Amino acid sequence: MKKTLQDEIEAILRKRIMVLDGGMGTMIQRYKLSEEHFQGQEFKDHSRPLKGNNDILSITQPDIIYQIHKEYLLAGADIIETNTFSSTSIAQADYGLEHLAYRMNKCSADVARKAAEEITLQTGVKRFVAGALGPTNKTLSVSPSVERPDYRNITFDELVDAYQEQAKGLLDGRVDILLIETIFDTANAKAALFAIQNLFEENYAPPRPIFISGTIVDKSGRTLSGQTGEAFVTSVSHSDPLCIGLNCSLGAAEMRPFIETIGKCTTAYVLCYPNAGLPNTFGDYDETPSTMATHLKDFAVDGLVNIVGGCCGSTPDHIREIAEAVKKCKPRVPPASVFEGHMLLSGLEPFRIGPYTNFVNIGERCNVAGSRKFAKLIMAGNYEEALSIAKAQVEMGAQVLDINMDDGMLDGPSAMTRFCNSIASEPDIAKVPLCIDSSNFAVIEAGLKCCQGKCIVNSISLKEGEGDFLEKARKIKKFGAAVVVMAFDEEGQATETDVKVNVCTRAYHLLVDKVGFNPNDIIFDPNILTIGTGMEEHNLYAINFIHATRVIKETLPGVRISGGLSNLSFSFRGMEAIREAMHGVFLYHAIKFGMDMGIVNAGNLPVYDAIHKDLLQLCEDLIWNKDSEATEKLLRYAQTHGTGGKKVIQTDEWRNGSIEERLEYALVKGIEKHIVEDTEEARLNGEKYPRPLNIIEGPLMNGMKVVGDLFGAGKMFLPQVIKSARVMKKAVGHLIPFMEKEREEARLINGSVEEEDPYQGTIVLATVKGDVHDIGKNIVGVVLACNNFRVIDLGVMTPCDKILQAALDHKADIIGLSGLITPSLDEMIFVAKEMERLAIKIPLLIGGATTSRTHTAVKIAPRYSAPVIHVLDASKSVVVCSQLLDENLRDDYFEEILEEYEDIRQDHYESLKERKYVPLSQARKHGFHIDWLSEPHPVKPTFIGTQVFEDYNLQKLVDYIDWKPFFDVWQLRGKYPNRGFPKIFNDKAVGEEARKVYNDAQNMLNILISQKKLQARGVVGFWPAQSVQDDIHLYAEGVVPQAAEPIATFYGLRQQAEKDSSSTDPYHCLSDFIAPLHSGVCDYLGLFAVACFGVEELSKTYEDDGDDYSSIMVKALGDRLAEAFAEELHERVRRELWAYSRSEQLGVPDLRRLRYEGIRPAPGYPSQPDHTEKLTMWRLASIEQATGIRLTESLAMAPASAVSGLYFSNVKAKYFAVGKISKDQTEDYALRKNMPVAEVEKWLGPILGYDTD
């Protein structure tokens, strides 16, 4: 018999470790290809840019791809991957090339085949080509819309079609292997496997070996769609891959534990091709070839791998060293079997059912035929509340969820799809496998197409004959599901023991012998039928099931037995206590005889021994048919003892606790409802709490200590802490009048009264002079107050003398300074100097978005001899303050900080010596150059001058809100892959709290908009503009720029940090994107300023009411609305007001990804770090007079919820960071701006590449 490719490759894998190639994209980047290279001759007139579409290079630059393949092969790669990572019609649609998908794959395979055959001939060592199928840019498991968790922008069938087209091109190009790689969503991979199987069934025999490679996105060990490594393997192993493993996302060192997991749960060979380490701050990969090779050699020595290679950042040099490192290592020996005798299922997590697994509860309540509540919710389209039923089933112990949508009034496939998709958005539910239950096979298929895990299908039978049975079974196997087979054949439902056994035996052999089903994936349901009906022929139904179960388990190895338990007691509808007892007794016996699982109401099964003895005996008699009057006796029992109903859960049970327990519970849970009456109850207990202060120092502070401990341990999140603080304030607010009365009485008696301080310490907080941003500071204040610190919050724009005087007046233990804009850094230095001069030797904390440990260590700490500490966020503030005020820890902590900051300073000054800068003249010479005469002429705006927008419609802005920064305010940060919005809702740690805060935000937004609490105002302006070197001159309308004086000038800063010797990247300046004065091309520049008014006032109202949560919420939403205003207005500028991109049709996600033409950089940000450029904007457009947005002395905008910037329309304009500059540019810039060099250095401090001290 002729050897297949699989035989050939497997023979090599048994002998040695094979080597895969490295990063294709990494190598392509080295060629620094232009748009013209990507287009080639064929696509030079293509309507969309193609740069970045690496896969098209197999058509337009095949010689480059061929050369890269050769480099990897000569470096020692046994297997090269085709350049087809994004060669599906789905991914290519972004470039308008979806019609080329087949050709792209065929060409890529041809190029790789040519290289492999040439090197095989040259070296005498057989080389192989793996056809790469990437994950596409869409996902079946995650909704792109937070408002619609059930929505998907791609279907399983569409993915199958796309993958089938791709695989066909690869197979026609003669690839040896099909490699489904970088799998972040297992559902997508299952669609690829389905497509490949379609081709193998049609006309591509013999099948090619399949390699499968997933992607674990971080140290949590899960894919982007949430699956663990073992669950992923379980979900795709039905395809019988030759190799399975991991690639991308992680470096080798980080990937090791997950490769070990993969190896323990598969009989396939294991492949591993990690990135060259983790990306650095610039997104590049730094791990050297020798380091990467050392890590992978360790894998090999420990017997973990069969194939190794590289992904992102890896090069032929990496592959050469890896090949050499593993050359003499023995390959991993795959185990003959894993989890022998187990049924393997998966949701987001694996679920193994083995010989010693306890009875498996399949939750029954998500069934429109079995739960009236569930049916009502589904009929009403209330899928969100229907999910709560599923979640409750899991919480009550369901290990699998049965989903059934069989109702004549429902569109079954649609309802099943919608509900399964909704489940995928809830990790607490999606962690368990699903049992897709329907009598309509189209509904079953709809459910299977939504599930990334390995499901159970419930059910198929021989009712329609063998042909129908085999067809459905083959399709189920192709989906990778386990199957429930009913004891039902062409003659009807089996009721007798021998008939049940015969039907199941026949089905077993058809499944195992003809379809190739793993016996461990077969579940038989021998029919639990209703007893106690009064019909004699039904009396043996329970006994027949139990006896059939025993025989089936003894004669059909590997199978499991299940059944629908509620059928048993259907005669006793409405008598819940009777039904539950019957179920408990039946299961007690059926499990002993071999029943493995059942569809039950999880959590409602009584323990056999806990059933009342009289009821127990009656159930025993009925089930075992011991008493012909058992049914009547049970009915009489029900009449005597009551039918039994659902238990009522006491939701306010905590109200029965002691007053101390109630106060603590209210604080921890943030419940305001009873806090005043409970506080008053404590106050009236004069024996226990003789003074109101005793209540604050006692139960209230104890409760807040619990809150602080939970927050510090990561078990409470910031929004919850702030709600706790609101409750605390309300309690203290109730006690204050009584405390004041007590003090007044003491003063009358004693003439004076000594003030008592119950706090851990006093801290003065302030946003420094010239800065109006205070959300972060307010949050720190709330968190510190929750941890028994007395917080003196001085607000925003606080002068140094006021800060220091407050510290003296309140006998502060610590001062905390906050700031958002770069000029605030200088004010912080000034405060530190003044503290040193006035000998106020208390710790100084530094925080805020613009601050850093480096700036604190280098610029602030040397000015002050007491502790100066940079605090990252609110969660760190408590620890820092506690250590600074603890006499036992303070000195050691300060010493540690001193040493750490000294190291930072040394590193900083060493880095200044190492940094190299090109002279300004050279940077200008190598700036970004545009051929203005060959480019389309700039579009003239629809008006010159300004247009003011009064009372802008806030409702229009809501869809443009970017929610990620909103969650950052609340310090709710999901772990990868759940960092962004709406993925954060899927995060196991913060997802639930994030959703609560988001819902609160939605409610607040409705109030703000409907009640007109806030007002949005803005201004836009356009002027003729020309560049002169690094500056942009603006002119009045109608003049000839070459013969006129500019009405304003915006000064630019140019990149100077020396670039890599091989780099052709230009040294950017914003002026590069405006036509030069001498070009003869008329160009234009725009500007804008927008703000939300009323935020501070409304926030202050909430704060005065003791509602810190709403106070911070208003500010956070004010900032988001201002940013949304800027986004929405920029869209209008592009399409209407400037109209240089009239046909733009972009969704909000595209706007977020900056897929539009033009940019809107802001002074004070990386592309122009100088805040003083705002002065020109405000003067030119009369911004303060037009809108009310003013500039502070530090050039922060007031109100704080404000955004401003410039508009550039050129299609080649892009955002960049100026980075550090050298002194020659500072001096030149000062000369052009007619400012003293020292003044310019003050404003540009953070970007100076030299020390000014």
UniProtKB/Swiss-Prot annotation:
<feature type="domain" description="AdoMet activation">
    <location>
        <begin position="911"/>
        <end position="1253"/>
    </location>
</feature>
<feature type="modified residue" description="Phosphothreonine">
    <location>
        <position position="1252"/>
    </location>
</feature>
<feature type="domain" description="Pterin-binding">
    <location>
        <begin position="359"/>
        <end position="620"/>
    </location>
</feature>
<dbReference type="InterPro" id="IPR050554">
    <property type="entry name" value="Met_Synthase/Corrinoid"/>
</dbReference>
<comment type="function">
    <text>Catalyzes the transfer of a methyl group from methylcob(III)alamin (MeCbl) to homocysteine, yielding enzyme-bound cob(I)alamin and methionine in the cytosol. MeCbl is an active form of cobalamin (vitamin B12) used as a cofactor for methionine biosynthesis. Cob(I)alamin form is regenerated to MeCbl by a transfer of a methyl group from 5-methyltetrahydrofolate.</text>
</comment>
<dbReference type="InterPro" id="IPR036589">
    <property type="entry name" value="HCY_dom_sf"/>
</dbReference>
<dbReference type="InterPro" id="IPR003759">
    <property type="entry name" value="Cbl-bd_cap"/>
</dbReference>
<dbReference type="GO" id="GO:0008705">
    <property type="term" value="F:methionine synthase activity"/>
</dbReference>
<feature type="binding site">
    <location>
        <position position="1160"/>
    </location>
    <ligand>
        <name>S-adenosyl-L-methionine</name>
    </ligand>
</feature>
<feature type="binding site">
    <location>
        <position position="567"/>
    </location>
    <ligand>
        <name>(6S)-5,6,7,8-tetrahydrofolate</name>
    </ligand>
</feature>
<dbReference type="InterPro" id="IPR000489">
    <property type="entry name" value="Pterin-binding_dom"/>
</dbReference>
<feature type="binding site">
    <location>
        <position position="437"/>
    </location>
    <ligand>
        <name>(6S)-5,6,7,8-tetrahydrofolate</name>
    </ligand>
</feature>
<keyword id="KW-0170">Cobalt</keyword>
<dbReference type="Pfam" id="PF00809">
    <property type="entry name" value="Pterin_bind"/>
</dbReference>
<keyword id="KW-0489">Methyltransferase</keyword>
<dbReference type="GO" id="GO:0031103">
    <property type="term" value="P:axon regeneration"/>
</dbReference>
<feature type="binding site">
    <location>
        <position position="822"/>
    </location>
    <ligand>
        <name>methylcob(III)alamin</name>
    </ligand>
</feature>
<feature type="binding site">
    <location>
        <position position="311"/>
    </location>
    <ligand>
        <name>Zn(2+)</name>
    </ligand>
</feature>
<feature type="binding site">
    <location>
        <position position="818"/>
    </location>
    <ligand>
        <name>methylcob(III)alamin</name>
    </ligand>
</feature>
<feature type="binding site">
    <location>
        <position position="525"/>
    </location>
    <ligand>
        <name>(6S)-5,6,7,8-tetrahydrofolate</name>
    </ligand>
</feature>
<keyword id="KW-0597">Phosphoprotein</keyword>
<feature type="binding site">
    <location>
        <position position="962"/>
    </location>
    <ligand>
        <name>S-adenosyl-L-methionine</name>
    </ligand>
</feature>
<keyword id="KW-0808">Transferase</keyword>
<dbReference type="GO" id="GO:0031419">
    <property type="term" value="F:cobalamin binding"/>
</dbReference>
<feature type="binding site">
    <location>
        <position position="312"/>
    </location>
    <ligand>
        <name>Zn(2+)</name>
    </ligand>
</feature>
<keyword id="KW-0486">Methionine biosynthesis</keyword>
<feature type="domain" description="Hcy-binding">
    <location>
        <begin position="6"/>
        <end position="326"/>
    </location>
</feature>
<dbReference type="Pfam" id="PF02607">
    <property type="entry name" value="B12-binding_2"/>
</dbReference>
<feature type="binding site">
    <location>
        <begin position="770"/>
        <end position="774"/>
    </location>
    <ligand>
        <name>methylcob(III)alamin</name>
    </ligand>
</feature>
<keyword id="KW-0028">Amino-acid biosynthesis</keyword>
<dbReference type="InterPro" id="IPR003726">
    <property type="entry name" value="HCY_dom"/>
</dbReference>
<feature type="binding site">
    <location>
        <position position="579"/>
    </location>
    <ligand>
        <name>(6S)-5,6,7,8-tetrahydrofolate</name>
    </ligand>
</feature>
<dbReference type="GO" id="GO:0071732">
    <property type="term" value="P:cellular response to nitric oxide"/>
</dbReference>
<feature type="domain" description="B12-binding">
    <location>
        <begin position="760"/>
        <end position="895"/>
    </location>
</feature>
<dbReference type="InterPro" id="IPR004223">
    <property type="entry name" value="VitB12-dep_Met_synth_activ_dom"/>
</dbReference>
<comment type="similarity">
    <text>Belongs to the vitamin-B12 dependent methionine synthase family.</text>
</comment>
<keyword id="KW-0479">Metal-binding</keyword>
<dbReference type="GO" id="GO:0009235">
    <property type="term" value="P:cobalamin metabolic process"/>
</dbReference>
<comment type="subunit">
    <text>Monomer. Dimer. Forms a multiprotein complex with MMACHC, MMADHC and MTRR.</text>
</comment>
<dbReference type="Pfam" id="PF02965">
    <property type="entry name" value="Met_synt_B12"/>
</dbReference>
<dbReference type="GO" id="GO:0005737">
    <property type="term" value="C:cytoplasm"/>
</dbReference>
<feature type="binding site">
    <location>
        <begin position="370"/>
        <end position="372"/>
    </location>
    <ligand>
        <name>(6S)-5,6,7,8-tetrahydrofolate</name>
    </ligand>
</feature>
